[in-house]
Amino acid sequence: MRLINRPFYMDKLSKVAGSPDIKVITGIRRCGKSKLLEAFASQLRSNDPSANVIHVNFNLLEFEPLAEYHALHTYVEKHYIEGCRNIVMIDEVQMCEGFERAINSLHASEKYDIYITGSNAFLLSSDLSTLFTGRTVEIEVFPFSLAEFSAYQEITSPAEALARYVREGGMPGSYIYQDERMRFSYISDVLETLILRDIRQKYRIRNAEQLKRSCEFLMDNVCLLYTSPSPRD
């Protein structure tokens, strides 16, 4: 999938670049967090060719041995270069057991400009102050907006863009499929993963079918007011 410029998020990242804060990029699965981090890494390298970017992507099998906080910390420290800007970027950080201990230690050393991404099923805003001892800046990423969808699909007609956006949605990973049924299947799979794996696992929900029905109720009634007993009714 090709990259597009997402200026809203790139501007947010640029404003905190180089700060001592831990930059945390959150968002639902497949909304474009990793691609955004990739684009921002390219921008940082372009602006400062001497910068040392230490990039760990836990989506890639080659980084599986680092999925424990001691190993992750050791890897980053081994790749540190004295005398230049050292930037740490860790994709899907929640896949590393005890990741917060590695991040807190790296942050305490005051040697790194730190960026991490993670699913907000595991990194909720309320969790950040508990997990990290240093100050965090959260940048929440959403699926493509109508403007981003239009730019990606190179659609100039507002009416056509809106009609297609309503039908196809903002999940960028679905755009590689030309067949509408394949796109729908992709989005359904993402939804199933969010509900039945991420949310259920995080909150230890035993009744998966009830959880699924509750989510379907909320999606079907997104414009209505409801109280907590409503989904049960």
What are these regions (language model features)?
Residues 3, 142, 146-228, 232:
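Interdomain hinge/linker elements that couple catalytic modules in large macromolecular machines
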Residues 5-17:
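Pre-Walker A adenine-sensing motif
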Residues 113-119:
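Structural recognition of the conserved hydrophobic beta-strand(s) that form the central parallel beta-sheet
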Residues 56-80:
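Short glycine-rich substrate-engagement loop in P-loop NTPases that contacts/grips substrate
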Residues 36:
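Hydrophobic positions on the alpha1 helix immediately C-terminal to the Walker A/P-loop
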Residues 25:
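Hydrophobic anchor at the beta1->P-loop junction of P-loop NTPases
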Residues 33:
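Conserved lysine of the Walker
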Residues 123-136:
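Short regulatory helix/loop adjacent to the ATP-binding pocket of P-loop NTPases
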